Amino acid sequence: LNPAKHMIAVTSETSPLAHNPDYLAAFYMDDYIGGRYSSTSGVGGAVLSLAFGPQVFADFLDGAAAADATAKNKDIRKNPALMDALIGIYERNVQEYPSTAVLPYSQALSRFPAHLQQLDMESNGKQVNRDGNAINYVTGPVIFGEPGTNGQHSFYQLLHQGTNIVPLQFIAFSKNQTGKDVVIEDSTSQVKLCANVVAQIVALACGKKDADPNKTFEGNRPS
């Protein structure tokens, strides 16, 4: 395989690879851009544009810019990122919950929990502040997750009945994200998937008593 015909380089303009004739082309990114932001740089731009076309990447950047603008809003009722951050601080430092589960009910987001895991745990995985002084509070939870309904048959047992309370973040869509919705017994597969989400949220919040202690779950689990 000839790199000059099949491979591109995405690197800093000061890198030895920047003007290397052994590659078909080079795309540049500033050397101060960290990995957690690379999806909106030349790294993400090259991959998304080649795979889906430049307009998709342009739309992606527009969405990122809109999210940035929303994150600057001082009104917490209009700033979901700020609301989520404050809830997370409360759950970790006041309630002392050790972890958070991200549960997308869409196979299209199968890797989204891992993405959030990297963003949150790399960004907050510190023991000193920017001045080098030791931090006297907990910086973040362990983030994990899996698409539903796979997780329901994997680790939801602990979420419902375990002795540790794990805050949950459910993600669901009214429409199928892959365009492959099917009708089964008078309702679509997406409707059934959404019903699973609602049932889990209600069960986690309300719990259920049973004569058999092994089947009892107390509820009062935040999601």
Q: Where do the language-model regions lie?
A:
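A SIS-like phosphosugar-recognition module
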Residues: L1-S223
